[in-house]
A protein has these predicted regions:
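Glycine-rich beta-strand-turn "strand-cap" elements at beta-sheet edges
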Residues: 4, 34-53, 78-103
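Short, flexible helix/strand-to-coil boundary loops that buttress conserved ligand/catalytic motifs
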Residues: 23, 68, 81
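Solvent-exposed strand-to-loop "edge" motifs in beta-rich extracellular domains
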Residues: 10-12
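Short, structured motif recognition centered on aromatic/hydrophobic residues
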Residues: 3-8, 19, 31, 52-58
Length: 103
């Protein structure tokens, strides 16, 4: 049974473009190669501008750890982590199950 990963990132306004590019070119392709499915990715237009919300579908809780361990061992991770350190203010990670009424 799948588990969903809801990630909210508060990103510096000046770093939003760089963050989005890093996700598009590095993180998303790598994590999809690990079997994660990006169910949605959003940039807030109201509330705190620049917040980014990602919704991923994973096989199970262990899938999260396996993919992150593989990413941290990859040559691209150091540059990606440096970009995150410069652009992300905070990150909230939540695991969730699909509600009974979801289609």
């Amino acid at each position: 049974m799948s588990v969903f990963l809801h990630v909210t990132l508060e990103v510096h306004a000046a770093g939003l473009g760089r963050f989005l590019e890093g996700m598009e070119k590095t993180a998303v392709p790598f994590l999809e190669d690990q079997g994660w499915k990006l169910a949605g990715a959003f940039v807030q237009r109201t509330g705190r501008l620049g917040n980014v919300i990602d919704l991923w579908e994973l096989d199970d809780f262990q899938h999260y750890d396996r993919a992150l361990q593989a990413f941290m061992a990859d040559d691209r991770f150091a540059a990606f982590a440096a970009m995150l350190a410069e652009t992300v203010i905070s990150e909230t990670v939540v695991f969730a199950d699909k509600a009974s009424y979801a289609r």
